[in-house]
Structure formats: C-alpha cells, structure tokens
Amino acid sequence: MSGLGLVVVSAPLPSGGRRVRAAGEILGLAFGARDVEEFLRRAGLEDVDVETSELIEWQGGGPDVWAPGP
C-alpha cells in the first residue's frame, strides 16, 4: 500500500475533467474513472475499485459525474 493517504477527486471543472490529488500533489486531470485508475496505478496503488474505495473522496459528484453542473 502506498503512503498517498486520501485521494481527492475534485468537482468537474467548467473546461472539463476533474483534478485528482493525493498527498498535496496533483496526480492529473481525469476525464473518466479509467483515468483515475491509471493515476493511482502510477502512484503505486494497483487494483483499486475507484467506484467503491474509501481511499477516494469524490467532490461535486461520484465516479459517474464528469461534466460540470448547471
């Protein structure tokens, strides 16, 4: 297990995508759940179910929300 701590997926940005952060660093800009999985894999976390993992805090909507609200 990596020392990333909580992974935060921000609310969808007006320009599209969601920032993914852990340990005070931006891991990347995700445009879907697979992007989040890849960022976690690169950070040393394999086989994380991004839809149910308690390691991930979804802000502004869950893993099925990728467009900004009205």
Predicted regions mapped to residue ranges:
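N-terminal domain-start interaction segment
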Residues: 1
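N-terminal acidic leader/helix
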Residues: 4-26
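A short, charged, amphipathic alpha-helix used as a generic interaction element across diverse proteins
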Residues: 31-44
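Mixed-charge, Lys/Arg-enriched low-complexity segments
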Residues: 42-70
